[in-house]
């Protein structure tokens, strides 16, 4: 059985919604066991609540120790000035022992994100994330243009060959569109199919 983890951080719920879509796509592939988890929050609860954070999220908290158990990990992070968020960075900075032991070498890695606008760092957030995965020896998988939703010119939409993304607007009022969720589901399915072949 191929084991795949969707691991995310979501402050306002946009990445959480995308994560569920990614997991849905991955679950559509037979003989792939999909787990959905999130990284720990760093902000004190009161500060997070005052900032409007969505604190009630069903996904359990992941541990660094469990990462080698999976054949693939699809990471989801909101952008922070074109980079991953501090919560995800803090989590990954604790994976030094996996780097030392080579525990993640050959694992499949993929990334999706959320930004405030079309030009808010969708692609740089994902590509800058890739450097961490490459240092761990992971094999990066994106979203090929066989995903027709990437070619949608009829609306403003996130998504690129680097990975799925959504545009939240500066005030967070915009929720992931059906086109963006389609790309997210495609990414989950594509990574699952690729990983299954690698494991076999």
UniProtKB/Swiss-Prot annotation:
Residues in Flavodoxin-like domain copies: 4-191
Binding site for substrate: 99
One Pfam family of this chain: FMN_red
Gene3D superfamilies: 3.40.50.360
Superkingdom of origin organism: Bacteria
Entry binding sites for NAD(+): 12
Cofactor(s) required, per the database record: FMN
Cofactor note: Binds 1 FMN per monomer.
Keyword terms, alphabetized: Flavoprotein, FMN, NAD, NADP, Nucleotide-binding, Oxidoreductase
Record protein name field: NAD(P)H dehydrogenase (quinone)
